[in-house]
């Protein structure tokens, strides 16, 4: 067994992975924001304290999870009125800043949105560009339906699941 005094090099830090989810119900009278984009002509938006962007929120939760930095509610929850009505992109940029301030580099974030609408594929490139700019690292977005099963399949709301990879060190 080596030791630092014997000249053995210190191993590089291991990557850390986090998982995040977010779920919001549709609510009449709200604009639909999803994956950092406003979706015109999609009918109702999502209920929430902020813009209720499930993709951005799940990405925030994944980043916080990977860095051991709490969760979305802790940083931006309903008890924090300064975040009321905030855009998901703003929250995501702030989440990335918090993670970096804790000494982590962000490798990437992958998010899958689950629901019947909007159809992510037609605006995937645009969404990935907006979210990647907010994070300062690659963000990929995919969509899935539930073949009519559960609340997303019945058109009652949206759900998103995300993973994030971070590594300690500048």
Curated annotation (Swiss-Prot):
Q: Which cofactor does it need?
A: a divalent metal cation
Q: Which GO terms describe its biological process?
A: isopentenyl diphosphate biosynthetic process, methylerythritol 4-phosphate pathway; terpenoid biosynthetic process
Q: What class of enzyme is it?
A: lyase
Subunit and partners: Homotrimer.
Q: What is this protein called?
A: 2-C-methyl-D-erythritol 2,4-cyclodiphosphate synthase
The Swiss-Prot or TrEMBL record describes its family as follows:
Belongs to the IspF family.
Detail which positions bind a divalent metal cation. Answer: 22, 24, 57
Task: List UniProt keywords, sorted A-Z.
Answer: Isoprene biosynthesis, Lyase, Metal-binding
Q: How is the cofactor bound?
A: Binds 1 divalent metal cation per subunit.
Give the Enzyme Commission number: 4.6.1.12
- Report the SS bond pairs: none
Quote the gene name from the UniProt entry.
ispF
Query: Which PROSITE patterns does the record match to this protein?
Result: ISPF
Job description of the protein = Involved in the biosynthesis of isopentenyl diphosphate (IPP) and dimethylallyl diphosphate (DMAPP), two major building blocks of isoprenoid compounds. Catalyzes the conversion of 4-diphosphocytidyl-2-C-methyl-D-erythritol 2-phosphate (CDP-ME2P) to 2-C-methyl-D-erythritol 2,4-cyclodiphosphate (ME-CPP) with a corresponding release of cytidine 5-monophosphate (CMP).
From which source organism is this entry?
Answer: Streptomyces coelicolor (strain ATCC BAA-471 / A3(2) / M145)
Q: Where does 4-CDP-2-C-methyl-D-erythritol 2-phosphate bind?
A: 22-24, 49-50, 71-73, 151, 154
Highest taxon of source: Bacteria
Site feature (Transition state stabilizer) residues: 49, 145
* Pfam families on file: YgbB
Q: Which GO terms describe its molecular function?
A: 2-C-methyl-D-erythritol 2,4-cyclodiphosphate synthase activity; metal ion binding
The reaction(s) annotated as catalysed by this protein in its Swiss-Prot or TrEMBL entry are:
4-CDP-2-C-methyl-D-erythritol 2-phosphate = 2-C-methyl-D-erythritol 2,4-cyclic diphosphate + CMP
Identify the pathway. Isoprenoid biosynthesis; isopentenyl diphosphate biosynthesis via DXP pathway; isopentenyl diphosphate from 1-deoxy-D-xylulose 5-phosphate: step 4/6
